[in-house]
């Protein structure tokens, strides 16, 4: 086998064929390079990511705040709308009650007017009928008296009775 130090023994640049030693040296170089150069690079990436996440969080918080304010305003508007609807409902009930009472009042007044008119018509008809019956009764009484009297009265008494009967008929 070839000695690992063979190639390096001449001086200058040589190959180290001992894999374990070579890997440790390579790992040390890589770890040193990562330690020296990677933190600023990864730190920059992580910082940009942190800034983006913070901006997203701030945006989310702003949207949450706006949504909460909008929800509160909507609830306030809803409560105001419910209150206005209740007020309108109460106003409608009061107006309907006023209209109903007014209608009842007008109906009662109309019924009273019709009743008064009917009573007045009935009284007028009763008065007319009563006057007609009195006239008819007086006429019949005069006719009966006139037919019975010619044999009982003389001409002068008969003429006086007819004049008085005509006078009574004129007053009635």
UniProtKB/Swiss-Prot annotation:
Pfam families (alphabetical): ATP-synt_B (PF00430)
GO cellular component: plasma membrane-derived thylakoid membrane; proton-transporting ATP synthase complex
Subcellular location: Cellular thylakoid membrane
Membrane topology: Single-pass membrane protein
Spans traversing the lipid bilayer: 27-47
Role description: F(1)F(0) ATP synthase produces ATP from ADP in the presence of a proton or sodium gradient. F-type ATPases consist of two structural domains, F(1) containing the extramembraneous catalytic core and F(0) containing the membrane proton channel, linked together by a central stalk and a peripheral stalk. During catalysis, ATP synthesis in the catalytic domain of F(1) is coupled via a rotary mechanism of the central stalk subunits to proton translocation. Component of the F(0) channel, it forms part of the peripheral stalk, linking F(1) to F(0).
Family per record: Belongs to the ATPase B chain family.
Annotated protein name in UniProt: ATP synthase subunit b
Organism: Prochlorococcus marinus (strain MIT 9313)
